[in-house]
């Protein structure tokens, strides 16, 4: 069963991520009074990127981007296989470093600046990422995803603060406003694309596929809050994921980009007040 879950994740996660990206573009366009692209536009974009000639800035960049993709795929595979969530999050953090190195491997000042901003974003959300694994252990007594989803009561009952912190840091992780410092998904915000400035053709396609794996992984972590031994918790978890993703899109469209100091301060304060306080309460009542 674990092998089936891993294979399904590896095959279906990019398609699910691309559909969510298409939904993001469509909803964002309607919020801005535009018609927007078709729902399948991300698939058309990938096909066009792969059809272009491979023009990487250097041979190292494509290797680092492939490493970024592979580590994200491995991290998600561990989550959907029911393995150790702590190991899953450690590998996820390692994947981020490959992206920073890929952006830093060329001489473009815009790409280098984007890589530096990405490092700041990692510093901002990483404490919440580690606290998340600790929170699941305090609430369920196990780091194993398979044990967490077999609990009689959903983890969100004991971890509402962690869920709020997760939703906050998810906006940073997915590089959505107001925390899209390293690169932007919207053309009206930034012509120069930060850490993806020198990525084009198949290299940019690999970057996009990696992001589709990442968004699926992040929503999988959201679903983990709502899953339990009751089969009815699965549709509830799916609905919760869609609601959370819609809230991220809404926040993305009503917010202006903040400066890096505001990013660090706000994220660390939210981490302390949500994950830190919730974790302290769980430690006291154990």
Range-by-range predicted roles:
Residues 1-286:
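Alpha-helical transmembrane segments of multi-pass membrane proteins predominantly involved
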């Amino acid at each position: 069963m674990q092998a089936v879950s891993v294979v399904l994740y590896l095959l279906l996660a990019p398609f699910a991520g691309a559909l969510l990206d298409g939904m993001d573009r469509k909803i964002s366009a309607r919020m801005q009074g535009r018609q927007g692209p078709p729902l399948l536009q991300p698939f058309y974009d990938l096909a066009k990127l792969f059809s272009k000639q491979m023009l990487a800035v250097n041979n190292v960049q494509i290797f680092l981007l492939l490493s970024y993709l592979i580590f994200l795929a491995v991290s998600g595979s561990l989550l959907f296989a029911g393995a150790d969530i702590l190991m899953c999050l450690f590998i996820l953090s390692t994947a981020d470093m490959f992206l920073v190195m890929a952006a830093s491997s060329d001489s473009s000042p815009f790409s280098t600046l984007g890589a530096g901003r990405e490092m700041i974003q990692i510093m901002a959300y990483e404490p919440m990422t580690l606290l998340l694994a600790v929170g699941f252990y305090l609430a369920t007594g196990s780091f194993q995803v398979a044990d967490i989803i077999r609990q009689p009561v959903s983890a969100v009952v004991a971890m509402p603060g962690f869920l709020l912190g997760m939703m906050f840091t998810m906006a940073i992780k997915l590089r959505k406003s107001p925390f899209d410092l390293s690169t932007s998904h919207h053309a009206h915000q930034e012509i120069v694309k930060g850490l993806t400035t020198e990525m084009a053709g198949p290299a940019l396609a690999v970057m996009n596929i990696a992001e589709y794996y990442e968004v699926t992984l992040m929503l999988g972590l959201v679903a983990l809050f709502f899953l339990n031994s009751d089969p009815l918790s699965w549709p509830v978890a799916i609905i919760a994921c869609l609601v959370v993703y819609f809230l991220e899109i809404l926040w993305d469209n009503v917010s202006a980009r903040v400066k890096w100091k505001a990013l660090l301060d706000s994220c660390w304060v939210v981490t302390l007040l949500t994950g830190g306080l919730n974790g302290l309460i769980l430690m006291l009542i154990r």
